[in-house]
From Swiss-Prot:
It is an enzyme of class 5 (isomerase). The active site is at 279 (proton donor). This is Methylthioribose-1-phosphate isomerase. GO terms for molecular function: S-methyl-5-thioribose-1-phosphate isomerase activity. It catalyses: 5-(methylsulfanyl)-alpha-D-ribose 1-phosphate = 5-(methylsulfanyl)-D-ribulose 1-phosphate. NCBIfam families: eIF-2B_rel (TIGR00524), PRK05720.1 (NF004326), salvage_mtnA (TIGR00512). It comes from Candida tropicalis (strain ATCC MYA-3404 / T1). InterPro entries: IF-2B-related, IF-M1Pi, IF_2B-like_C, Initiation_fac_2B_a/b/d, M1Pi_N, NagB/RpiA_transferase-like.
Length: 410
């Protein structure tokens, strides 16, 4: 189904009729098209092709796809052939669709724990279905609840930080990729903090000496999630923002930090926070997130070390549910980094627009010399040394101790 009506509902699961539809995020912001997911294979392809993305969202879609797959199987007349062993193999296969994001692996491993109560030779039955259904519903509901808690906890951290710095006036926040409703069950993680902060600290609402004036989403090459998705969400919610390319970050921070405007119709509001999501946070706090996140942390560190006094210091915040924390992996060196196809870097895909801005057919346009060598990792790892805080649904925000170490818990 397709329309031009805008929506922030990335995952639609019909709990009565057991149907799963996902918003095809490859077509945003120009088209709102939902794809039906009826099998585990459907989910694998949607996740692999990034029609759905964001660590929490792909975990939820993965779990719901198993529910729908089993439900449809049990409706068949000949439903005595599928064994637990086959389902376990399907789960292992589904995990490989996006190996860096720990949420998907965690969810599917939880389902494998459910299956350990059965013999591999057992036939898939209604009891197994109901247990996986209940788990998946809980996963979805808890993610939404946790995202709202992340937003509130991030807001409190921002308020306390600015008060401690005795900061006054307008400030800005920078982010990368998409970490909002389109990447989760709703509200979002990093973008959820931005939502909560703007609602409480926009100029007309703020009871503090400071207010959130502007958001700067990075374009997020090569897949452009910041340009396509985060801008879509910010515009939808009427949160003031200006899109920038990934290679404009240093110049923007420097300009605003030197009390200069970047546009005549904007105030001077220094970037005080860079808030990012996470696909995996390991035991020491090293964080895998969208490629380009690491460089944001090094830029913030440069300005904090060499350029800015405390009033203009930039806090680098990671926002993620505790399901993203991986205590079994010691450091970021052990994280498997997914590499994407070369054509995602050497081509651009999007609809043609005529002079009136009307949307036409989707086309692929080359932007690089054909056949060249390309390196296209989907993620990088930000060292914990460059992270100021990790905000989860726990009201106690994770900050480093006197030795510069995080002590993370699940």
């Amino acid at each position: 189904m397709s329309s031009h009506t805008r929506t922030l509902e990335a995952i639609k699961f019909d709990r009565e009729n057991i149907k799963l539809d996902i918003l095809n995020q490859l077509l945003l912001p120009y088209s709102t098209t939902y794809i039906s997911i009826s099998t585990i294979e459907d989910a694998f392809q949607a996740i692999k092709l990034m029609q759905v993305r964001g660590a929490p969202a792909i975990a939820i879609v993965g779990a719901f796809s198993i529910v729908v797959d089993i439900f449809n199987y049990l409706k068949l007349e000949n439903n005595t052939s599928k064994k637990v062993k086959e389902l376990i193999e399907s789960l292992d296969y589904l995990i490989t669709s996006r190996p860096t994001a720990v949420n998907l692996a965690n969810a599917l491993n939880d389902i494998k724990e459910i299956l350990k109560n059965y013999n591999e030779s057992d036939i898939i039955n209604k009891e197994i279905y109901e247990k996986i259904y209940n788990y998946s519903i809980k996963l979805y509901d808890e993610d939404l609840s946790n995202n709202k808690k992340i937003g509130e906890n991030g807001l409190n951290y921002i308020i306390n930080t600015l008060k401690n710095q005795k900061f006054k006036g307008p400030f800005s926040i920078m982010t990368i990729c998409n970490t909002g409703s389109l990447a989760t069950s709703g509200h979002g993680t990093a973008l959820g903090i931005i939502r909560s902060t703007y609602e409480s600290l926009k100029k007309d609402n703020s009871n503090e000496d400071f207010y959130l004036d502007h958001i700067y989403p990075c374009e997020t090459r090569p897949y452009n999630q910041g340009a396509k998705l985060t801008s879509y969400e910010l515009d939808y919610e009427k949160i003031p923002f200006t899109l920038i390319c990934d290679n404009m970050v240093s110049s923007l921070i420097n300009t605003l930090g030197n009390d200069k405007k970047i546009k005549n119709d904007q105030q001077i509001a220094p970037v005080k926070f860079i808030i990012v999501g996470a696909d995996r946070v390991v035991k020491n706090g090293d964080t895998a997130n969208k490629i380009g996140t690491f460089q944001l942390s090094t830029i913030a560190n440069y300005f904090n070390t060499n350029k800015f006094d405390e009033n203009k210091q930039i806090k680098f915040i990671v926002a993620a549910p505790k399901t993203t924390i991986d205590l079994n992996t010691e450091t970021g060196d052990d994280i498997i980094i997914e590499e994407r196809p070369a054509n995602e870097l050497t081509t651009l895909v999007g609809p043609q627009l005529n002079q009136q801005g009307e949307v036409g057919e989707k086309v692929t346009v080359g932007v690089a010399t054909p056949g060249i060598s390309v390196w296209n990792p989907a993620f990088d790892v930000t060292p914990h040394e460059l992270i100021d805080s990790i905000v989860t649904e726990d009201p106690n925000v994770f900050v480093k101790d006197a030795n510069g170490n995080f002590t993370l818990t699940k």
